[in-house]
Amino acid sequence: SWYTYSPIRVRFPYVRSALLKVWKEAMQKTNDPVEAWEVISENPGMQKAYKQARGKGGFVRANWDEVNMMIAAQLIFTIKKYGPDRIVGFSPIPAMSMVSYAGGARFLNLIGA
């Protein structure tokens, strides 16, 4: 595919700087990713800080380990608090890419969504 080699392709994860800031603060306090996300999601001040930054750009480059940990913590927190059926996913139709579809569908199946 041409897109793989395109110079405009995004090759690294980017996170809204306000969210990354509150994430790092919460991680320093708790040293546990799931507890850190709980602190963020149940603290109105922290929620406001990153939610008000939406639509204003401000994305910064992050590393894969940090982003994957943040995503996993959010999923685990949601499953613990609300149950696995509250996770909604999207995979393209199988005709587009069976590998992409099967990977997403299998992940959702494994977490009980």
Task: List where the protein language model places each region.
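N-terminal export/assembly segments and adjacent metallocofactor-ligating motifs
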Residues: S1-A113
